[in-house]
Amino acid sequence: MKLVIVSGRSGSGKSVALRVLEDLGYYCVDNLPLPLIGSLLEQLKGSNDLVAISVDVRNLPEQDKVLVKQLASLPEGTELTSFFLNSSDKVLLKRYSETRRLHPLSKSRVSLQEAIKLEGKLLEPLSQQMDHYIDTSNLNIYELSDQVRQILLGSVDKELVINFESFGFKHGMPTEADFMFDVRFLPNPHWEPELRPLTGLDEPVAEFLNRQPLVNKFIWQIENLLETWLPHLERNNRSYLTIAIGCTGGQHRSVYVAEQLAKRFSNGKHKVNARHRELSHAKA
């Protein structure tokens, strides 16, 4: 089992780090009381091999001593990585002023500036227990995400999941699409009596469309467009990219084009899915 502990001052980016861990498949628990670490791992044993918890100043006093005790009693074979995120007082004050969020220690009737300084002192012993110290004062959320991935994976690369979805315009456009292509101008197998009851997944329809130069050219141009811009989309820390392909009914042309694009991109480094909305609805 792999356990990641994320701690740090409020406003330094703990929630960003947890989102990165969640994207990497970790079971994440925010603000877990330290005495519960052992019982959490025991409950998740066998079902989740990747676990991440965040620890902040609200957990309990003398956190460093409790943490040392908990880490000493971790189950055998637990691989531990820990982060402490920090920012300068000036940056934290600016972030809180911009977001207008309440600092965890503001309830003790101290000013925001005093709460920030007090938290830094309270967390100082805990920071000494962490493996990795990240100063986020000059980092944006993407740069912080890259640093966390670099430490955990040895690489900043993030697996992008590409979903190719076929649909029929007469049934409405998919709202989750990042890119949408209209293939209603392509030759339509619907007008071939022997092909009408079939779908774009059937070989006769695939052979018919594969013989059409216009179809092949359009697929190639979509492929070229996506290959050109995928690196830029990945650098923007996307987790999913949905490419919607629409024809009139979502039965022939859009299904075939989505399948062909999925096959071409499945040979690369990305995880690729093909989904056919109207065919799924027909089965249901």
Swiss-Prot record:
Keywords tagged on the record: ATP-binding, GTP-binding, Nucleotide-binding
Family: Belongs to the RapZ-like family.
Pfam families: PapZ_C (PF22740), RapZ-like_N (PF03668)
NCBIfam families: PRK05416.1 (NF003828)
Protein name: Nucleotide-binding protein SO_3964
Protein's UniProt keywords contain Cell membrane: no
Residues binding ATP: G8, R9, S10, G11, S12, G13, K14, S15
InterPro entries: P-loop_NTPase, RapZ-like, RapZ-like_N, RapZ_C
Transmembrane segments: none
Single GO molecular function: ATP binding
Keyword flag Nucleotide-binding: yes
Function, as annotated: Displays ATPase and GTPase activities.
Residues the record lists as binding GTP: D56, V57, R58, N59
Superkingdom of the source species: Bacteria
